[in-house]
Amino acid sequence: MPVITLPDGSQRSFDHAVSVAEVAASIGAGLAKATVAGKVDGKLVDACDLISNDATLQIITPKDEEGLEIIRHSCAHLVGHAVKQLYPTAKMVIGPVIDEGFYYDIAYERPFTPEDMAAIEKRMMELIEKDYDVVKKMTPRAEVIDVFKARGEDYKLRLVEDMPDEQAMGLYYHEEYVDMCRGPHVPNTRFLKAFKLTKLSGAYWRGDAKNEQLQRVYGTAWADKKQLAAYIQRIEEAEKRDHRKIGKQLDLFHLQEEAPGMVFWHANGWTVYQVLEQYMRGVQRENGYQEIKTPQVVDRILWERSGHWSNYAENMFTTSSESRDYAVKPMNCPCHVQVFNQGLKSYRDLPLRLAEFGACHRNEPSGALHGIMRVRGFVQDDAHIFCTEDQVKKEAADFIKLTLDVYKDFGFSDIAMKLSTRPAKRVGSEELWDRAETALADALNESGLEWEYQPGEGAFYGPKIEFTLRDCLGRNWQCGTLQYDPNLPERLDASYIAEDNSRVRPVMLHRAILGSFERFIGMLIEHYAGVFPAWLAPTQAVIMNITDKQADFALEVEKSLNGSGFRAKSDLRNEKIGFKIREHTLLKVPYLLVIGDREVETQTVAVRTREGADLGSMPVAQFVELLTQAVSRRGRQESE
């Protein structure tokens, strides 16, 4: 007779094995109707699954994050149902949940078209309206093989082969369609009404370009139509903010086929890049970092010693010269250890903070490249702190404070911090892991901000802190990291002389704040929709004359502003002033200065903002003060 304990501590007793759905019904009809699945003793199960022994139970509904994931997973199965009805010769592969949606990979004789996607979506809606139950059957392995053989589902059979230890598998039936899954899934299609298919793409079986190409159908699903509409609106806004589109409009950069994953920076974009670099250079100098520069191409011997050659070679660009093999560096850390190793180091030299704006290259798959967000050639704001174990906590705490201050300067204040702890497969003693994790946790606590653990997500050699930024559209971007590493100093024989004259390995803290300049600039473009704060804008002010008579004064103002360290340009074209204002507003220049006869006479400028605000006429010195304040504020609000 199972006793079921609910989240509020109340208990319900039953005189027989009871399903999650039955427990929900015993509580109330409304909850029974909303039940998607259950969590029994912390494990997700289907609503139809039986509970035979005493257990804790949480009823999962569409309001729960797990419920939303289950809805999305079931929508992927619904894609399979619709596709098999419309295209009976299609072979179904896999259909997992992804962030805010799902996809299904399908093998078919031709690429799907937008018309196909519309037809699949229409059929899915028709199937949902049938309001049928999704039936789960735990099925012996041999029978599962027979089911998929009879249906000619070759890929499903290959997936069964990948699980030799599974003696029984869950089959989920959508009427005549059957799919294999660990589950759980929704009990009825009524939960799937708030969905939309979003795009088509190609994919490879098992993600390997050497394998056959598949069709990938993407979609999203939500708890209700209101959430779906909000998501669609957010996606439409994201498309307007696409950094590739804005990059072209503002003449920031371009990419071309002859250099896949490599950025051609134009003057405007390179200006933004240089502002970032100069800002980070100043920040690091103020915080005790020494800037260095290391080679781009390094002999494979170093990569073998560091372990990268055996674990990362397929992502490295390589070349040969005079019977020696070289690699273009995919990361800076082994080279930084070489700088540390030059000359004897004492405990008095630590902590030693080495920073580099290091150009790295990684041979990313062409299908993974995305604008300047995912590239093959990039520059990191990379640094490595060599320190004693006792110094780790302070160095981590200082880095956390520095990182959060930098993000505020770029207009990001919603930051999630996570501590990734020891994975199952790891090196080093438990005592070392305890000390490392405690030092990083204590540093996070000193920040006074909320943070969370990511159990088991650390590297095999040490824990790490991750910083995730939330942009104006609510999207999360993982940027900064602080990685504890006692492993690379060991591999590359780094040491210092301790107070007792013994040789000791330093702890190496890998750290980055922006991540890569390219990706961070892409984020900034989309976060601001190209409307950069004044300190980042490629052109901060444009001076426009009304007639040729004001040209000389316009040039004087331009010279004065540039001489004061600002980025100003004159537009002396023989065009109507309204045309000029509109053009530079579209180019998102923060300040538009108009000069007519009255301004020449009074030696002033009429100031407008790109938002259309008329700030009136003022002396150039007053405008310089206004612009100085705007630039010094960086991306922070006036109240910060």
UniProtKB/Swiss-Prot annotation:
Compartments in which it is found: Cytoplasm
Entry-linked Pfam families: HGTP_anticodon, TGS, tRNA-synt_2b, tRNA_SAD
Protein's GO biological process: threonyl-tRNA aminoacylation
Keywords attached to this entry: Aminoacyl-tRNA synthetase, ATP-binding, Cytoplasm, Ligase, Metal-binding, Nucleotide-binding, Protein biosynthesis, RNA-binding, tRNA-binding, Zinc
Catalytic activity: tRNA(Thr) + L-threonine + ATP = L-threonyl-tRNA(Thr) + AMP + diphosphate + H(+)
Statement: the UniProt record of this protein carries the keyword Protein biosynthesis: yes
Entries under CDD domains matching the protein: TGS_ThrRS, ThrRS_anticodon, ThrRS_core
Residues covered by region (Catalytic): 242-533
This enzyme's EC code(s): 6.1.1.3
Residues annotated as transmembrane: none
Top EC class of this enzyme: ligase
Superkingdom of the source species: Bacteria
Function text: Catalyzes the attachment of threonine to tRNA(Thr) in a two-step reaction: L-threonine is first activated by ATP to form Thr-AMP and then transferred to the acceptor end of tRNA(Thr). Also edits incorrectly charged L-seryl-tRNA(Thr).
Protein family membership: Belongs to the class-II aminoacyl-tRNA synthetase family.
Protein name per its UniProtKB record: Threonine--tRNA ligase
Organism of this sequence: Pseudomonas putida (strain ATCC 47054 / DSM 6125 / CFBP 8728 / NCIMB 11950 / KT2440)
